[in-house]
Amino acid sequence: MILLTGGGTGGHLFPALAVAEELRRRGHPVFYLGAEGGLEARLLPKTPIPHALIPAGKLDRSALRPQEAPKVLQGVLRAQALLRRLRPKAVLSTGGYAGFPGGMAASLLGIPLLLHEQNARLGLANRALAPLAKGLALSVPLALPAPLARKARVVGYPVREVRYPKDEAKRRLGFDPQRPLLLVLGGSQGSLELNERLPPVLKGLPVQVLHQVGERWVERFRPLEGEGYRVEGFVDTPLAMSAADLLLSRAGAGTLAEAAFHGLPAILFPLSPKLDGGAQLANARAYAQAGGAVLGAWDRLSSQILEALEDLEARRRAMARLSPEGAAARLADLLEAFL
């Protein structure tokens, strides 16, 4: 058995699910260890993957929050008990606060631990676990200290490798195949900033819009809907990205990897570095440097959208060159080497 852990948000959960799917396809039994209250608590019951949820205290960027310390300790102890019972041959942690207890428990029990980092810099959980791990898989090349660099390998970001013909995808979503479609994503929880500031900018632009506002914001922003403008709490990402001609979003690693897989150029509004330590800004700059994305500017966003629509083919090619296709298989190969 191979145990996978990580989550809390979609950026950590979805790559682990993609690897789980690949491992199951190869005949390996898998088990998923997630966090109580994380996104996985809602999504895992809808999958065929056996799973358990444990407490997982949130890590702070400067020091462990006193009120979270008991949860962190409890989570590690619960994870240890579970791993002793399941006896997995290897553990993959995709990070996030949900991935720390299982990763630490694997290290304490001497079970081979493989980490996967999604962003253009190591996250807190992976930073803490990396010295203890047997392997470190990266989505993009990172500058690392020599001890970590020796066990690191760039594999890409695992995504659901599903595509649909563009015209078919637009029709399935109820859009005109002959008109460009702008897909707006604010991350798995939605972005209030994008939800509030974007609609006035889009008035009069020659685009259809599929706007994922986040489930908690659906009723508030439902009145935005009209001809060629759809509001959804959650979207089928492979279908939506297959249909879209241009993406406007935050700069989470998962969203960008999926956009690259679909060759979907993007206009990006990364989170403030005060909120995520600069991970999204680093992601956005990497994709912009490659030519597949630009950093959005509210004072000229209308022009940026029009410029992107006029230059779609070149930007599509640049984005597609960053495709993570095969990443789930490469991670599965690394895990099999531990068995």
Curated annotation (Swiss-Prot):
GO terms for biological process: carbohydrate metabolic process; cell division; cell wall organization; lipid glycosylation; peptidoglycan biosynthetic process; regulation of cell shape. Its main location: membrane. Its EC number is 2.4.1.227. InterPro entries: GlcNAc_MurG (IPR006009), Glyco_trans_28_C (IPR007235), GlycoTrans_28_N (IPR004276). It is found in: Cell inner membrane. Belongs to the glycosyltransferase 28 family. MurG subfamily. This is UDP-N-acetylglucosamine--N-acetylmuramyl-(pentapeptide) pyrophosphoryl-undecaprenol N-acetylglucosamine transferase. It comes from Thermus thermophilus (strain ATCC BAA-163 / DSM 7039 / HB27). The lineage of its organism: Bacteria, Thermotogati, Deinococcota, Deinococci, Thermales. The gene is murG.
